[in-house]
Amino acid sequence: MRNWLLLLTLFLAGVSSAQSSNELYQIISSVSKERIQADVTTLVGFGTRHTLSDTISPVRGIGAARRWIKAEFKKIAADCSNCLEVREQHNLVSKGSGDRIVKDVNIVNILAIQHSKKNPKRFVLMSGDIDSRISDPNDYTNDSPGANDNASGMAGTIEAARVLSKYRFDYG
């Protein structure tokens, strides 16, 4: 949690030289460890988020996790008059492309993009690793809840989107 706050602080200091110190403190203080913990719990609840796991089930696997993350980003966007652009990035990886790719897989990243109000070509891109795995990298059916294997990072990313969506930045 401290590392996450440090990264958020450094990010905000770097992109927002025009923002007041008070506004930066407001942004940082609005980060909620309870929301982050709730999001980690939700991500763990998908059982496994292995790259090769189920993409159809509404409650289990990488597909369910991706849909939930996308829905969270869309809720955040709706709360800020669509200040976030929510997108999917697809990449087909063929079987045999690596030691742990035992079947063709469509890898999908979920992105939330907050454009600068001055220059729309400048933006903050929020995304993170979604997947999790257990010791056997080719076991994509058994539970691998991964609270500390990408769930915490993705939960931090969702929280960053929640917090940053309340502000508009002038990335000159």
Give the label of every model feature segment.
Residues 38-115:
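A non-catalytic alpha/beta surface segment that caps or lines the substrate-entry region
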Residues 3, 90, 114-116, 128-130:
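Short, flexible loop/turn elements at secondary-structure junctions
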